[in-house]
UniProtKB/Swiss-Prot annotation:
One Pfam family it belongs to: SprT-like
Keyword terms, alphabetized: Cytoplasm, Metal-binding, Zinc
Residues of the active site: E68
Cofactor note: Binds 1 zinc ion.
Lineage of producing organism: Bacteria, Bacillati, Bacillota, Bacilli, Bacillales
Keyword Transcription regulation annotated: no
Protein name per Swiss-Prot or TrEMBL: Protein SprT-like
Amino acid sequence: MNQAELQRHMEEVSLQFFQKEFRHQAVFNARLRTTGGRYLLKSHNIEMNPKYLENFGLAYFIGIMKHELCHYHLHLEKKGYQHRDQDFRELLKKVDAPRFCATIPREITMHEYTCKSCGKSFLRQRRFNVNRYRCGSCGGKLIQTDSKKIYTENP
């Protein structure tokens, strides 16, 4: 999905669920990490996280769109648009939008190092120069044996 398709989807979702037009811009923002989208109060634009579309699919992504459109329409109507406001919670229930997003699994590269002398192995996230460091147990030389990707739930 590109920016134009996102804009079209946002306008369609707004008309279908809120019976109101979406008159501002919807854009992808890949820098968003722990949030599915955000409504910008000053410009009234909505930024969406493309990783949620990739990881969870279009149906879940439309739920996030509905959540952001709740902020959008309530703010323009000068009603309570924040998560704690009663107007916001009622509109979320009415349009069946999620209150929170699921976390995206994060990809971490783990590097395995092994001691040549004692055979002890350990994992590190950051690589290091094996010529500058020694084994903490026996003082032997270290070698990098493996690098693997691990997916975690925490952001």
